[in-house]
Amino acid sequence: MKFDPEKIKKDAKENFDHAWNEGKKMVKTPTLNERYPRTTLRYGKAHPVYDTIQKLREAYMRMGFEEMMNPLIVDEKEVHKQFGSEALAVLDRCFYLAGLPRPNVGISDERIAQITEILGDIGEEGIDKIRKELHAYKKGKIEGDDLVPEISAALEVSDALVADMIDRVFPEFKELIPQASTKTLRSHMTSGWFISLGALLEREEPPFQFFSIDRCFRREQQEDASRLMTYYSASCVIMDEDVTVDHGKAVSEGLLSQFGFEKFLFRPDEKRSKYYVPDTQTEVFAFHPKLVGSNSKYSDGWIEVATFGIYSPTALAEYDIPYPVMNLGLGVERLAMILHDAPDVRSLTYPQIPQYSEWEMSDSGLAKQVFVDRMPETPEGQEIASAVVAQCELHGEEPSPCEFPAWEGEVCGRKVKVSVIEPEENTKLCGPAAFNEVVAYQGDILGIPNNKKWQKAFENHSARAGIRFIEAFAAQAAREIEEAAMSGADEHIVRIRIVKVPSEVNLKIGATAQRYITGKNKKIDIRGPVFTSVKAEFE
């Protein structure tokens, strides 16, 4: 909290030790629910795929490549030009774009009656306005998402009524079936490179070195641990009169060495795609130390990571490109799986989707989900709670019956004396579980004593909820005393006995933690004999 520096300097000159010790009063005492680890500074994290993309961008640029964005939507005729006789096989794996046709809607007398019933009497002029707007929509002058607002503005009626009118009067809009176009979503980055390079030659002369990292789409039969229907391709091209296969090898090593790969093996690719010159299509295998001994088929450290080749003159000629072009491509997700030690591309890409990944919640995360339910709402109430805890710490082992005054003052306009009591004989002021602390340990949430048996559980301070049973009970007692003061009671006693569930000691566990613990077959074990009471006497 804020303080007066001049007063502090004056007090320090008079009595330095006293002023120094008084400094504790300047530091706010957090409430139980404000304590660490519930008070935390969150930080953002990059998605592993986007993190890998950024690293690839930097790696390419360090090698002197310039970034380019290639067309994502490619007409099927481009695929025929690039792939020749392979085009149909390639198109079989492409997603075609489709759109809803725009119906030619008529307005009969029956429909006019329905419109009038919904919108009221808008007259012939209003019907004509609807006709004009529908005609403009049919001609493409109005976009689909603007049709309702346009009719609404023309008729000066609400959007909701117009939407209801279209839904009930014009069923044609609900019966529309998408019609496929000849445009596809790019399945290979190559589809975009031919278009970009052909256009660029009209304005610039090679040599060129470009890279592009962007989405591609493939109509796979199904997605599995190693393939998705949409993925990122990190592709580059070198256009130069003297470019050779060796440039592909050099780029492979230069790029992949920046990601920890140490050895390289180049093998002719058996696929022999028609857009590459025969015998230039090459698979790149690389050795990465992180893979050695892993639980994967790459435990020997070797993995196929890229493919390169020289574009075929027959494909380049379709775009009037007279220069050789070396192209290299690699899947970003495969590289990300190596860098982030991920066994499944689905869980790597979509970790938020339960069907793709195991839910893992840290002990620290579980501890953040433990809260005190009822808290005092006044400064005096907070003082009462602290005083109750202090008396229990001082006299918890005292034999009963016993009573210890804890706090005296005014609460909600009424004077009150607060004591910690244990009226029963042959016991103690506090039961043996009173000072148990809530800790998350190995996926469980436990209420346990801080002793040698549980030393391992208490070593991780970020997994300690920072709440003892007696503190949670004292908070409840203080809140009840505040309520008793406002209700006009003369006396109020708050008791706690054997705790069997968190709510009996004024604790609540967040719903997220409860779902996690239930799903993982873990446990919430907060129980034990607390046995103490707090008495408030009002004047």
Curated annotation (Swiss-Prot):
Q: Where does substrate bind?
A: 188-190, 233-235, 275-276, 327
What are the boundaries of the signal sequence? none
The UniProt entry's GO biological process terms, in alphabetical order, are: translation; tRNA aminoacylation
Give, as one word, the top-level EC class.
ligase
Family to which this protein belongs: Belongs to the class-II aminoacyl-tRNA synthetase family. O-phosphoseryl-tRNA(Cys) synthetase subfamily.
The record, for InterPro entries, names: aa-tRNA-synth_II, aa-tRNA-synth_II/BPL/LPL, O-Pseryl-tRNA(Cys)_ligase, Phenylalanyl-tRNA_Synthase, SepRS_C
Q: Which domain of life is it from?
A: Archaea
Catalysed conversion reaction = tRNA(Cys) + O-phospho-L-serine + ATP = O-phospho-L-seryl-tRNA(Cys) + AMP + diphosphate
Q: Give the protein's recorded name.
A: O-phosphoserine--tRNA(Cys) ligase
Question: Tell me, what does this protein do in biology?
Answer: Catalyzes the attachment of O-phosphoserine (Sep) to tRNA(Cys).
Keywords of this entry = Aminoacyl-tRNA synthetase, ATP-binding, Ligase, Nucleotide-binding, Protein biosynthesis
| Enzyme Commission no | 6.1.1.27
Origin organism lineage: Archaea, Methanobacteriati, Methanobacteriota, Stenosarchaea group, Methanomicrobia
Cited PROSITE patterns:
AA_TRNA_LIGASE_II
One of the record's GO molecular function terms: tRNA binding
Q: How does it assemble?
A: Homotetramer. Interacts with SepCysS.
SUPFAM superfamilies, alphabetically? Class II aaRS and biotin synthetases
